[in-house]
UniProtKB/Swiss-Prot annotation:
The lineage of its organism: Bacteria, Pseudomonadati, Pseudomonadota, Alphaproteobacteria, Rickettsiales. It comes from Ehrlichia chaffeensis (strain ATCC CRL-10679 / Arkansas). This is SsrA-binding protein. GO terms for molecular function: RNA binding. It comes from the Bacteria. InterPro entries: SmpB (IPR023620), SsrA-bd_prot (IPR000037), SsrA-bd_prot_CS (IPR020081). Belongs to the SmpB family. GO terms for biological process: trans-translation.
Amino acid sequence: MDIVVENRKVRFNYFIIQEFDAGIVLIGSEVKSLRQRKVSIAEAYVTERNMELWLCNLHISEYNQASTRNHNPTRPRKLLLRKKQIYKISGNIKNDGFTVVPLCLYFNDKGIAKVKVVIVKGKKLHDKRETIKTRDWNREKSRILRGGN
């Protein structure tokens, strides 16, 4: 599994409820830009239209060696999932407090582009502070066990 890009802010800003691996419909110049890691998923989110899931605001830069007919960098891209998974995700999109965002974009062992989407619930400010405290304590604990300062 070759991870192209990961949205690390998701783990800090949200509680992860459930993860799904989804295929993504891309054109050739988009795949080549992905292989060059010219992609940003910081502002991306998943929406539902006509019982299909779409990944919006995923920015894949234009491929320089492509012809003049290059792709639109922020166009909505269709996600490929099983019907049961689509029903589960679309039901959570309609619930208050839940959202669906991409966690990472990667190429699997066969070289196919996949996106890991997660159902998340937003954290409050005190939850974020608690996350920081536990992370710092674990770091300090490992330092003490190693015998360092």
